[in-house]
UniProtKB/Swiss-Prot annotation:
Record-given protein name: Guanylate kinase
Entry-linked PANTHER family: GUANYLATE KINASE, GUANYLATE KINASE-RELATED
Subcellular location: Cytoplasm
InterPro entries, alphabetized: GK/Ca_channel_bsu, Guanylate_kin-like_dom, Guanylate_kinase, Guanylate_kinase_CS, P-loop_NTPase
Gene transcribed to yield this protein: gmk
Residues covered by the Guanylate kinase-like domain: 6-192
Length: 214
């Protein structure tokens, strides 16, 4: 039996661009009947020292750990990448990532540009996607509508967003989230197209290709 290895997808975006909502919608869409056995996307669950927000679940949204535990994991080489954002540490488990890919699942990493650079340096075959808002004004409005942060925090997030967006050119694909449904279709198209590359088709249909050319 042919062993099919999953593909790693790096998805980055400034806070408020809709990355989390788009990834959730992508995951929901693959549960639809017409996807059947093709449904094999997983989302990596990062470790973080950030405080848990209302509605979040440990082990589902993030693996929440204290700073001492996180630093110990760095010392033991447990992370493929790690970064500090707004004073909070985030990292991706190396062993979990490799196990998921070896099982044939595509894996989504939702990380910032710093983490993306670290991952691409070690796994250049990873696909990378950057999600942009239609305008800065729209981004600011989305952050304000969340109702989670003070004006001071929102200003800090906007400065961080501009810095994050300046790295969009380092990514293979760019999705502008102006219309959510359209952006979701663009995201789906990237995954569909990647599964049709010669390399992926060779893995899936190697016996067929041999038979056709016999």
């Amino acid at each position: 039996m042919t062993h099919i290895t999953g593909t790693l997808y790096i998805i980055s975006a400034p806070s408020g661009a809709g990355k989390t909502s788009l990834v959730k919608a992508l995951m929901d869409a693959q549960q639809e009947p017409q996807h059947g056995a093709q449904a094999k996307i997983r989302v990596s669950v990062s470790h973080t020292t950030r405080a848990m927000r209302p509605g979040e679940v440990d082990g589902v949204n993030y693996n929440f750990v204290d700073r001492a535990t996180f630093l110990s994991m760095i010392e033991h080489g447990d992370f493929l990448e790690q970064a500090e954002v707004f004073g909070n540490l985030y990292g991706t488990s190396q062993s979990h990532l490799q196990q998921t890919l070896d099982e044939g699942h595509d894996l989504i990493l939702e990380i910032d540009w710093q983490g993306a650079r670290q991952v691409r340096a070690q796994m250049p075959q990873a696909r990378s996607i950057f999600i942009l808002p239609p305008t800065q004004q729209a981004l600011r409005q989305r952050l304000t509508n969340r109702g989670q942060d003070s004006d001071e925090i929102i200003e800090a997030r906007m400065r961080e967003a501009v810095s994050e967006m300046s790295h969009y050119s380092e990514y293979e694909y760019v999705v502008v989230n102006d219309d959510f449904a359209g952006a979701l279709e663009d995201l789906k198209a990237i995954f569909r197209a990647n599964r049709l590359t010669q390399q992926h088709q060779q893995e899936q249909y190697s016996e067929l290709f041999q038979e056709l050319l016999a």
